[in-house]
Structure formats: structure tokens, C-alpha cells
């Protein structure tokens, strides 16, 4: 026994409306991405048409060609307007679906697998830290060495002055 064609049509229509309700956010995002790509493509075509159009600046032009290009341009603009409305609907629907969700940081969504490169980076960081510590110590030792050299120079100057005074006294005595 077959169902009447009208009943089949209404059953198919109910299935389609149910499927339309069950569209998930990921497929909406894909539809939005395709819509954006269509918008970019149409915009590029509009610029191509505008670039190829000749302005009526005294040069003979064919009115039919001009009207044809103008018609194409207007059709592209209408299509672009429809695509932007479609994109707005997809955007609103995505926001509606995601309204109750809390944003999850992207770091938590990406699984972390420790690999050799992270170990290598840790080793390099440790070596860098050790090298900078060693350099700091060398700079400290150089600073202390300069201070000690200054002190030795002062002592040598004092000894030289003392020896000169002793020699002067001995010379006066003799």
C-alpha cells in the first residue's frame, strides 16, 4: 500500500525542517566560512568588472557592452548583499548556540605531548642560565680584582714615598 503523494511531501518537509533544526555549530561555522569565501570571490569579480569597464570620456564605446557590464555589476552587488545577509544569519545563529557556553582557553583545547624538542629547550635554558651565572661571577671577580689592584697601587705609592723620605733623611745626615 502506498501513501498518497501529498502525505509523502509533508513527511519529507517535516524531515527537512527537523534536519534544519539539528544543524550544529561546527557546520554553521563551515557554512559561514564558505559564505566569506563567496563574498571575497564576488568582491574580486566586482573589482575585475570595474577595472575592465571603460569610462565614457569621449571615446566611442558600445552602449550594449556598457549596459551588459553594468547589469553584471548590479547583479554581483545584489548577490553580495544576499551573501552578507546570509553571513549575518549564520553569525547570529552561532552566537545563539554558544550563548550558554563558557569560553575555554585554547591552551586547554590543544593536547600537550612532551617531545624531545621541549627537553632540548629545557636543556638549552639550563645551559643559558648556567652561562649567565658564570659570566656574572666572572664580572664580580674582575671588579674585586680591580679594587685589590687599586689598593696595591696605593700601598706601593705610600712605600715609594716612605723610601724617598728615608733616602732624603739619610742624604741630609751625611
Curated annotation (Swiss-Prot):
Keywords: Activator, Coiled coil, Nucleus, Transcription, Transcription regulation. Residues 113-166 form a coiled coil. It is found in: Nucleus. GO terms for cellular component: mediator complex. One of its GO terms (molecular function) is transcription coregulator activity. One of its GO terms (biological process) is positive regulation of DNA-templated transcription. Pfam families: Med30 (PF11315). The keyword Transmembrane does not apply. InterPro entries: Mediator_Med30_met. Component of the Mediator complex, a coactivator involved in the regulated transcription of nearly all RNA polymerase II-dependent genes. Mediator functions as a bridge to convey information from gene-specific regulatory proteins to the basal RNA polymerase II transcription machinery. Mediator is recruited to promoters by direct interactions with regulatory proteins and serves as a scaffold for the assembly of a functional preinitiation complex with RNA polymerase II and the general transcription factors. Belongs to the Mediator complex subunit 30 family. Component of the Mediator complex. PANTHER family: MEDIATOR OF RNA POLYMERASE II TRANSCRIPTION SUBUNIT 30 (PTHR31705:SF5). This is Mediator of RNA polymerase II transcription subunit 30. It comes from Danio rerio. The gene is med30.
Amino acid at each position: 500500500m502506498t501513501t498518497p503523494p501529498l502525505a509523502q511531501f509533508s513527511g519529507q518537509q517535516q524531515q527537512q525542517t527537523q534536519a534544519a533544526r539539528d544543524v550544529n555549530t561546527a557546520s554553521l561555522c563551515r557554512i559561514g566560512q564558505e559564505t566569506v569565501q563567496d563574498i571575497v570571490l564576488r568582491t574580486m569579480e566586482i573589482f575585475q568588472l570595474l577595472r575592465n569597464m571603460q569610462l565614457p570620456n569621449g571615446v566611442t564605446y558600445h552602449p550594449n557592452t556598457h549596459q551588459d557590464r553594468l547589469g553584471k555589476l548590479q547583479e554581483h552587488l545584489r548577490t553580495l548583499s544576499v551573501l552578507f545577509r546570509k553571513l549575518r544569519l549564520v553569525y547570529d545563529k552561532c552566537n545563539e548556540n554558544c550563548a550558554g557556553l563558557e569560553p575555554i582557553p585554547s591552551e586547554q583545547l590543544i593536547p600537550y605531548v612532551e617531545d624531545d624538542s621541549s627537553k632540548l629547550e629545557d636543556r638549552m635554558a639550563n645551559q643559558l642560565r648556567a652561562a649567565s651565572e658564570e659570566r656574572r661571577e666572572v664580572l664580580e671577580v674582575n671588579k674585586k680584582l680591580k679594587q685589590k689592584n687599586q689598593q696595591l697601587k696605593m700601598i706601593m705609592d705610600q712605600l715609594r714615598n716612605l723610601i724617598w723620605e728615608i733616602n732624603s733623611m739619610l742624604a741630609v745626615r751625611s
